[in-house]
């Protein structure tokens, strides 16, 4: 009878990553009952950074979910363990949040193990999800917009009394403003480490302002740049009137 490892397929990876992935799958086979294992992330895509980890998605039939973070042969790995029903719920939730992380892992990852038709069925659903726009409710988008504006206003208020807090809040609001560019366009949010490059592809001048903001320590300059970024993205620099829909 074939073992789980006998039924695995392996991607073409650099030796250290290949060894780590095989060790991780061995750990999974020994401790879980997988019907599917999918490896994804920058290591699999061939463009890892020095601290990149293996992203490994495990599909099992047990009605439990778990996350394991563990080193294998010196390489960090994040292991996500879920039953099919939970995965489908993640698809819907992440479509609404604008960050389809689960769908992206399943659709673009390498199938190391597939012992059940549900693996390919989930991958097909994931691919379909990625062709569809986010389902973020307009009210949540407006709340995020207001949060960015209010945070900038707080940063400006604190520039004399508490400069450190002003620096902190200004940094927070810039990320929210840049996210609004994608929410307003009804497209998925990029990963945080890809955010500035994704902005540059849409608006090079806006990206240059963001880079200048993060590269300067001068609070006055930072707040001036934050104001320009606010004007370009959320269109407001502080409190504004709006009304949410009534809910029970």
Short names for language-model regions:
Residues 1-35:
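Helical scaffold of the NTase/Pol beta-like nucleotidyltransferase catalytic core
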Residues 37-82:
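Catalytic metal-binding acidic patch
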Residues 2-13, 68-160:
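Conserved NTP/Mg2+-binding pocket subregion across the NTase superfamily
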Residues 25, 35-36, 45, 89, ...:
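A positional/architectural concept
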